[in-house]
Structure formats: C-alpha cells, structure tokens
Amino acid sequence: MDIAKRLIDYGFHAPTVSFPVPGTMMIEPTESENLDEINRFCDAMILIRKEIDENPDLLKNAPHTMKMIATENWEYSYSRQKAAFPTSYVLNNKFWPSVRRVDDAYGDRNLVCTCEPIESYQWDFHNLEYK
C-alpha cells in the first residue's frame, strides 16, 4: 500500500494493491504507455526502493496533499520538497491528490451512502424542470 501511495507523489496513478494475490501490486503497463513513460515508472520504483531504506516515513505518509505541504507547521523528518516533488519531472507535471489516505478495510466493512435521497432525483414532468 505504501509504495502505491508514494507513486502518486511521483505523478502516477496508484496501481491495484492486493489483487489477485495479497501483499502484491498488480502493475499493468498498457500498449498506450510509451517507452519514456515506462522508463519513468521504473526510475520511480528504484527511487522509492531507496527511500524505504533512507526514510520510510516518506512512504508511510504518502501521498502528500497540497494542504499538507502548505501547512505552516511541518513536523516530518524530511523536506517538503522531497515529499511533494521527488523528481524534476513532477515539478512541471504535479498532480495534487485531494486526500491523504483512506482506511480501505474500514470503508469496505462500513459502507456509507453520501447520495441525495432518491426523491431529489425526480423530475416534475408537468413543469418540465428538475427538482
């Protein structure tokens, strides 16, 4: 999970984790990925592997949101630069995740519907307007 989340900081969509084998990542480059993109991905994986030894908190706290980086109080053992912009590519191509982490297991067991009540989706066909 940590590696998948850190990949977001490197500008990648996080790969599927724990499917089909628990404790693994399913990485599926497609025919639409060019060689430069695949090389960039491999470089990111190599750098993330080094981060595991140097400062595993970079992975444990990933992904780093704009709100997290912009906060006045920075209490981490690594720099904001290292957190949000781990490579020069990301400086010009940053994708900011809107949330940090979600407790997937809790969410799977405790589904909460945030939809409007079904009545709010009804049409008033007499006045032809959406309520």
Task: Please tell me what each predicted stretch does.
Residues 1-131:
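Non-catalytic terminal extensions of PLP-dependent enzymes
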